[in-house]
Swiss-Prot record:
Protein name: DNA mismatch repair protein MutS
InterPro entries per UniProt: DNA_mismatch_repair_MutS, DNA_mismatch_repair_MutS-lik_N, DNA_mismatch_repair_MutS/MSH, DNA_mismatch_repair_MutS_C, DNA_mismatch_repair_MutS_clamp, DNA_mismatch_repair_MutS_core, DNA_mismatch_repair_MutS_N, DNA_mismatch_repair_MutS_sf
Organism of provenance: Synechococcus elongatus (strain ATCC 33912 / PCC 7942 / FACHB-805)
UniProt cross-references to SUPFAM superfamilies, sorted A to Z: DNA repair protein MutS, domain I, DNA repair protein MutS, domain II, DNA repair protein MutS, domain III, P-loop containing nucleoside triphosphate hydrolases
Homology family: Belongs to the DNA mismatch repair MutS family.
NCBIfam families according to UniProt: mutS1, PRK05399.1
Example of a GO cellular component annotation carried by this entry: cytosol
A Pfam short name: MutS_II
Keywords carried by this UniProt record: ATP-binding, DNA damage, DNA repair, DNA-binding, Nucleotide-binding
PROSITE patterns in the record: DNA_MISMATCH_REPAIR_2
Any Gene Ontology biological process: mismatch repair
UniProt-listed Gene3D superfamilies: 1.10.1420.10, DNA repair protein MutS, domain I, MutS, connector domain, P-loop containing nucleotide triphosphate hydrolases
Residues engaged in binding ATP: G656, P657, N658, A659, S660, G661, K662, S663
Functional description taken from the UniProt entry: This protein is involved in the repair of mismatches in DNA. It is possible that it carries out the mismatch recognition step. This protein has a weak ATPase activity.
Length: 882
């Protein structure tokens, strides 16, 4: 940053330097010299430098912080020859609030804190050190995290078409690795995880700071990695296989990574080791305890690509990205933050293993049938705090006394939880029937040591109960005795001096004092020593008062230090139990999710789907889980669906009017399949669900302005992805393929796509369309059936019945939809006239039927039909008749 880039208002401060690198160090004050030395080591982070009650920023960082946080940008003297330099500051007690804003904007922050008091300082400066670096993916502070979603840090290693991925949430201890082939799979995993920060090894000589979302990526980052994430380029050395493996073995005290499942996965090891190195560098002494890395394969879970997650509105709505109206919104009845995070993960990573699915179903079934157990469980869960993050902060050494009390209260609820679930039969609930006794003992110890309402600050006393430590009680008794002496001093001095207005007071600057009005100053005894003169007041001390003050202050300092030491001991004790606490927390979170899904199932009248090993999808009276909750009770019209059985079709051509509910029906089927594979009950009267390997959706499209792609090109890219990756075990939901181009081109593409899905792939497919000519496919291919969303025609209007029935529609009623939208009557009348002419002259359906009755694989091409009717198109849009 040059001098010319200084904000104009700093000119009045005669500020000349905007960058600390512009200034010769020996011209700076000692404090500023130290600041510059620290900043040299952290050029890529914003440096927050503790000065008393504030964290200050200087030079270029001050300008950035003032701009991003909308703070006052002022200046500070940095040396006689340097003059004033830019400065901005935030109160130390508001660090979390301001730091979270900077992190959300994609900045990394280096915290340079005071590690000794002014009284402890040996030289002219209080010692300051970098205590931790906060980046988007390494946040531990409660106030900077979203309670009900994970904050993942990811690391990626790519070798050709092969890739390794590691991700961790340092606040909860989750640590996972994977390795696979095909960069598309890596892209989709990152979209699923939504990491706050992605690490990528680079040999570039200048490793820039964080690349914020939307910034142009350097050439070192492959195009397959989405622009919507925050990236940190890292030195390749920590990602080298030998170094990464050794770091993992040493950190987790292992002889082999076989137990972690990644011993034979070199790219996964490299990613995991590089991630661990970054956490150690940024968190310093506050490195949160991580679980041993666990390895998973993409083939273990149903694959949902980003397009499908968006179209099915799993965690946010498609229209405005809000939580309200999403599937997660409709299902989330969890009582704990841990449960909320786990439910989100279950929804984004459905299972393929039928046995695992049935285990979840069994627990939900039991909780549905035993309403008393379900309600008691949910009431008890409501009293349990976030065990994962509380124990994580304790392990990292950042937990305060209130954190430990919340942890203690939660641990003491566990025996009650075990007793409640003692009669549970399902394996997932039964795993909470035994709670390690040491956790209850730890909870008791914490409650016995900590006061009921401790302060947030840890160094100002008031943390530990009386009776815990003899030395602590003796110090408190001494301080209390001296304070009582001071409290009685005012009365005794009034009697001794005869001055009834005499008062005893205290200030942080001058300590204890005797206060008199200036009019009484000539009446003070000889042993009073003047300490301060104010406008209307004189302040004095006495030798005895000075001695007592010194005793109180020294004893209070010792008292505060002793309380802090006792607290740190308690916190350290908790850190030794983090692994056990988190194991229990995992089971508690699962019980919470299962109870929440049971609650939804009971109140929304869901059924338990039969999980099948074949391809059958049979839904009787299915409902959309979100839409039905948004409507008054009983208003939602249920619909059935049958796909993939010996008697049923593989592909349904779904026709019907605009706004009749076709898209809702598609999403309904997709969500029921997804819910079944997370082990949930589903909104239907009855359901038989065959395991699905992928769900594909193409519902609506818009221009992609960022890549210069039109609506039609976006649609074709999405369709190509489906045709290239779908299998016979996939579920494909397509809406309006081919509508983004000319009518006959669109019909040609729609016909060919539907035919390919039914004949070649034989994926279970619902193909919603306004091309009624596609109804002819059912006469050509045995595994295609026609269904329509019905309407009731009245003399002056139509009524949407929202019922899906066998048969193909021959009208779309688009003009009726336009009329309902409020188009002028002249436009509606003209549209009807043009429609009449088009219907009279069209030969498309006739041409398509030429193939009917012949071999299944032959039919007239839509291009031939185009040529046949080309001449008939002339004159269709001549002026209206009079």
């Amino acid at each position: 940053m040059t001098t010319s880039e200084l904000p104009e208002h700093l000119a009045k401060h005669e500020v000349r330097y905007a960058d600390h690198r512009q200034v010769e160090r020996d011209r700076l004050t000692p404090m500023m010299q130290h600041y510059a030395e620290v900043k040299d080591q952290h050029l890529q982070q914003i440096l927050l430098y503790r000065m008393g009650d504030f964290f200050e920023c200087f030079f270029q960082d001050a300008i950035v912080v003032a701009r991003e946080l909308e703070l006052v940008l002022t200046s500070k003297e940095a040396g006689k020859e340097v003059g004033r330099v830019p400065m901005a500051g935030i109160p130390y007690h508001a660090l979390d609030r301001y730091a979270s804003q900077l992190v959300e904007k994609g900045y990394a922050i280096a915290i340079c804190d005071q590690v000794e008091t002014a009284a402890q300082a040996q030289g002219p400066l209080v010692r300051r050190e970098i205590t931790r670096i906060i980046t988007p993916g390494t946040i531990l502070e409660e106030g900077m995290l979203q309670a009900r979603r994970n904050n993942f840090l990811a690391a990626v290693v790519i070798a050709g078409e092969h890739w390794g991925l590691a991700y961790a949430d340092s606040s909860t201890g989750d640590y996972w690795t994977s390795q696979s082939t095909g960069l598309e799979g890596l892209t989709q995993e990152l979209y699923r995880l939504q990491p706050s920060e992605v690490l990528f090894p680079s040999a570039a000589p200048d490793l820039a700071g964080l690349l914020r979302p939307g910034q142009s990526k350097p050439q070192q980052i492959p195009d397959c990695l989405p622009d919507s994430f925050c990236y940190a380029l890292r030195s390749p050395m920590p990602f080298e296989l030998h170094e990464a493996r050794q770091r993992l073995l040493e950190h987790f005290q292992l002889r082999s990574l076989e137990g972690c499942g990644c011993e034979q996965l070199p790219l996964a090891i490299r990613a995991a080791g590089g991630l661990l190195d970054y956490l150690g560098e940024t968190q310093r002494e506050s490195l949160a305890p991580l679980q041993k890395p666990r390895t998973y394969s993409l083939s273990e879970f149903l694959i949902l690509d980003q397009q499908t997650r968006r179209n099915l509105e799993i965690t946010q709505t498609q229209r405005d990205g809000s939580f309200h109206g999403s599937l997660l919104w409709a299902l989330d009845r969890t009582m704990t933050s841990m449960g909320g995070r786990l439910l989100r993960r279950w929804l984004l990573q459905p299972l393929l293993n039928p046995e695992a699915i049935r285990n979840r179903q069994a627990a939900i079934q039991e909780l549905c049938q035993d309403g008393r157990l379900r309600q008691d469980l949910r009431s008890l869960l409501q009293k349990i705090y976030d065990l994962e993050r509380l124990s994580g902060r304790a392990g990292a050494g950042t937990a305060n006394a209130r954190d430990l009390l919340a942890l203690a209260e939660s641990l003491l609820r566990l025996p009650e939880l075990a007793q409640l679930l003692s009669r549970a039969q399902s394996p997932l609930l039964a795993q909470l029937q035994q709670v390690p006794p040491e956790l209850e003992q730890l909870g008791d110890r914490l409650q016995q040591h900590l006061v009921e309402s401790p302060p947030l600050q840890l160094t100002e006393g008031g943390l530990i109960r009386s009776g815990v430590a003899i030395a602590l009680d003796e110090l408190r008794q001494q301080v209390e005795s001296d304070r009582q002496w001071i409290a009685s001093l005012e009365a005794s001095e009034r009697t001794a001096t005869g001055i009834n207005s005499l008062k005893v007071g205290y200030s942080k600057t001058f300590g204890y004092f005797i206060s008199l009005s200036r009019s009484k100053a000539d009446q003070v005894p000889d042993h009073y020593i003047r300490r301060q003169t104010l406008t209307n007041e004189e302040r004095f001390i006495t030798p005895d008062l000075k001695e007592r003050e010194s005793r109180i202050l020294n004893a209070q300092t010792d008292l505060n230090q002793l309380e802090y030491d006792l607290f740190v001991g308690l916190r350290s004790e908790v850190s030794h139990h983090v692994e056990t606490i988190r194991a229990i927390a995992t089971a508690v979170a699962a019980a919470d999710v299962l109870a929440a899904l049971a609650e939804v199932a009971v109140y929304q009248n869901y059924c338990c789907p039969e999980i099948r090993d074949d391809r059958q999808l049979a839904i009787q009276d299915g409902r959309h889980p979100v839409v039905e909750q948004a409507l008054p009770s009983g208003f939602y019209v249920p619909n059935s669906c049958g796909l993939g059985s010996d008697r049923g079709p593989d592909l349904i051509v779904l026709t019907g009017p605009n706004a009749s509910g076709k898209s809702c029906y598609l999403r309904q089927v997709g969500l029921i399949q997804l819910l079944a594979q997370i082990g949930s009950f589903v909104p239907a009267k009855n359901a038989q669900v065959g395991i699905c390997d992928r769900i594909f959706t193409r519902v609506g499209a818009v221009d992609d302005l960022a890549t210069g792609q039109s609506t039609f090109m976006v649609e074709m890219n999405e369709t190509a992805n489906i045709l290239n990756h779908a299998t016979a075990r996939s579920l494909v939901l397509l809406d309006e393929i081919g509508r983004g181009t000319a009518t006959f081109d669109g019909l040609s593409i729609a016909w060919a796509v539907a035919e390919y899905l039914a004949r070649e792939i034989q994926a279970r497919t619902i193909f919603a369309t306004h091309y009624h000519e596609l109804n002819e496919l059912s006469g050509l291919l045995k595994n295609v059936a026609n269904f329509q969303v019905t309407v009731k025609e009245l003399p002056d209007r139509i009524v949407f019945l929202h019922q899906v029935q066998p048969g193909g529609a021959d009208r779309s009623y688009g003009i009726e939809a336009a009329r309902l939208a409020g188009l002028p009557s002249e436009v509606i009348d003209r549209a009807r006239e043009v429609m009449s002419r088009i219907e009279k002259h069209s030969r498309i359906a006739v041409g398509l039927r030429r193939g009917n009755g012949s071999q299944r694989r032959t039919q007239a091409s839509p291009q031939q039909i185009d040529a046949t009717i080309a001449t008939e198109q002339l004159g269709l849009f001549s002026g209206p008749s009079h």
